A protein has these predicted regions:
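Alpha-helical transmembrane cores and adjacent cytosolic helix/loop segments
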Residues: 2-221
Length: 221
């Protein structure tokens, strides 16, 4: 292969990589915007209807925003420096995602304890059902495309962000089951056990993010 062919191949690879980074950027922007809207909506109606699970779900949406911002920052820097080793940027993004998982786990456990302690019953769970259904479809689509782009770029940070979104998908199912369960049984603490299980999952994913970040740090060294 002569020099001209090598330069042409390098240009093609760079263009392909840039296209994938643009997709990752759009996914991060959608994640941030959607979760900001969902978080504000959920917290407002959660407090309005005294539905702790919905309010807690809204706070968890803000955690997803943190992870999305980390990915957004990483992708923008990599788009400006396509030939740079992405490990140093991915390490920071993985740590941000790891912290997001830990915050999510703590928030879920505290919300569950508060639910059980107060034995609180919401006025209505209608908005919880609406938010959960919309969130399930949105999170599923985001997970699908984040995993696809993450694998194509071989980016552990984007794949971990997909796991963060997956945790929110599971939480959406818990919110839906809790809202429907309360509607038909009147038991206010139905979601507590499921929320604790998700908290355990979130903690494990957070720990894995930090382990991968340490691996990236070693590679950088």
């Amino acid at each position: 292969m002569n020099t001209a062919d090598m330069e042409s191949l390098a240009t093609t690879i760079s263009q392909s990589k840039l296209k994938l980074y643009k997709r990752a950027l759009i996914l991060a922007q959608i994640t941030i915007f959607y979760n900001l809207v969902e978080g504000l909506f959920s917290v407002f109606f959660g407090l309005e209807d005294e539905t702790l699970s919905l309010a807690g779900f809204g706070l968890d949406s803000f955690v997803e925003v943190i992870s999305g911002v980390g990915i957004l920052h990483m992708v923008r820097r990599l788009m400006r420096n396509l030939d740079t080793n992405p490990d140093q940027y991915e390490e920071k993004a993985l740590r941000i995602t790891g912290f997001s998982f830990y915050i999510l786990a703590i928030g879920l456990i505290l919300t569950s304890i508060l639910n059980l302690y107060r034995g609180h019953k919401p006025e209505t769970t209608f908005w919880g059902i609406v938010v959960a259904v919309i969130s399930i479809f949105t999170m599923w689509a985001l997970i699908h495309y984040k995993i696809k782009v993450g694998r194509q770029l071989n980016s552990e940070a984007i794949l971990e962000d997909a796991n963060c979104t997956k945790t929110c998908l599971y939480l959406s199912f818990v919110l839906l089951l809790a809202s429907v369960g309360y509607k038909y049984t009147g038991i206010g603490g139905i979601d507590s056990v499921g929320a604790v299980l998700i908290a355990v999952f979130a903690f494990r994913e957070g720990r894995e993010s930090f382990e991968k970040a340490r691996g990236k740090s070693c590679c950088c060294d």
